[in-house]
């Protein structure tokens, strides 16, 4: 899980979702998991 000010899709499997007011990137590649913080 990377914590970043700006979350971006890194590949075509990445999805940007908002959970409980937190922007996250979910992906089949665990290295691409991000959250805004």
Curated annotation (Swiss-Prot):
<dbReference type="Pfam" id="PF00444">
    <property type="entry name" value="Ribosomal_L36"/>
</dbReference>
<protein>
    <recommendedName>
        <fullName>Large ribosomal subunit protein bL36A</fullName>
    </recommendedName>
</protein>
<dbReference type="InterPro" id="IPR035977">
    <property type="entry name" value="Ribosomal_bL36_sp"/>
</dbReference>
<dbReference type="GO" id="GO:0006412">
    <property type="term" value="P:translation"/>
</dbReference>
<keyword id="KW-0687">Ribonucleoprotein</keyword>
<dbReference type="GO" id="GO:0003735">
    <property type="term" value="F:structural constituent of ribosome"/>
</dbReference>
<dbReference type="GO" id="GO:0005840">
    <property type="term" value="C:ribosome"/>
</dbReference>
<dbReference type="GO" id="GO:1990904">
    <property type="term" value="C:ribonucleoprotein complex"/>
</dbReference>
<comment type="similarity">
    <text>Belongs to the bacterial ribosomal protein bL36 family.</text>
</comment>
<keyword id="KW-0689">Ribosomal protein</keyword>
<dbReference type="InterPro" id="IPR000473">
    <property type="entry name" value="Ribosomal_bL36"/>
</dbReference>
<dbReference type="GO" id="GO:0005737">
    <property type="term" value="C:cytoplasm"/>
</dbReference>
């Amino acid at each position: 899980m990377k914590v970043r000010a700006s979350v971006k899709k890194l590949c075509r499997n990445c999805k940007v979702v908002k959970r409980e007011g937190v922007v996250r990137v979910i992906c089949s590649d665990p290295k691409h998991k991000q959250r805004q913080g």
